[in-house]
Amino acid sequence: MAAAMMNKTVVVGKESVKGGVAPKVAMSRGGFLNSGIMKKDRDMMVWQPFNNKMFETFSYLPPLTDEQISKQVDYILANSWTPCLEFAASDQAYAGNENCIRMGPVASTYQDNRYWTMWKLPMFGCTDGSQVLSDMQACTKAFPDAYIRLVCFDANRQVQICGFLVHRPPSATDYRLPADRQV
């Protein structure tokens, strides 16, 4: 029986071990083993709950470039969604008790309870991305110290499909690199 066990091969991760008994896998400090692949401790960090404010869809990314915004606008229009620009002062941009309209026992962080000012009307029937981009520039010129976001609506499903920031005030310090958002 012992001789049979000695000839057995056990696979541990990507390595095979002769003798049938797998050695204990040594864990390095700050790492863990997942399917035989060692991960770094930054992959297991805790999300920072303080001063880690987010906006809409792409908040985890660095601020979008003009080219990236243009591609998003093209995607929105290609799907026949209605774009709409909204803006808010820095102190009114985040969901909170001070700038939240209460409709019953709804928490202040519930996103539908926060309203931004609309820039003109939604761009119903818009098929030209340059029109959306020129309105963004006009809104930014009129309100340089405000947050400006682009939201879009699907008329068929009658819902907001997406929303993302297209302008942050120059004084904004809310964006943090993902590595800085963790403890």
From Swiss-Prot:
Key words, A-Z: Calvin cycle, Carbon dioxide fixation, Chloroplast, Lyase, Monooxygenase, Oxidoreductase, Photorespiration, Photosynthesis, Plastid, Transit peptide
Record's subcellular location: Plastid, Chloroplast
Keyword Chloroplast listed: yes
GO cellular component terms listed in the entry, alphabetical order: chloroplast
InterPro entries, per the entry: RuBisCO_ssu (IPR024681), RuBisCO_ssu_dom (IPR000894), RuBisCO_ssu_sf (IPR036385)
MF GO annotations: monooxygenase activity; ribulose-bisphosphate carboxylase activity
Transit sequence range: 1-43
One biological process term in Gene Ontology: photorespiration
Subunit description: Heterohexadecamer of 8 large and 8 small subunits.
Family per similarity comment: Belongs to the RuBisCO small chain family.
Other information: The basic functional RuBisCO is composed of a large chain homodimer in a 'head-to-tail' conformation. In form I RuBisCO this homodimer is arranged in a barrel-like tetramer with the small subunits forming a tetrameric 'cap' on each end of the 'barrel'.
The protein's role, per its UniProt record: RuBisCO catalyzes two reactions: the carboxylation of D-ribulose 1,5-bisphosphate, the primary event in carbon dioxide fixation, as well as the oxidative fragmentation of the pentose substrate. Both reactions occur simultaneously and in competition at the same active site. Although the small subunit is not catalytic it is essential for maximal activity.
Name of the protein described by the UniProt record: Ribulose bisphosphate carboxylase small subunit, chloroplastic 7
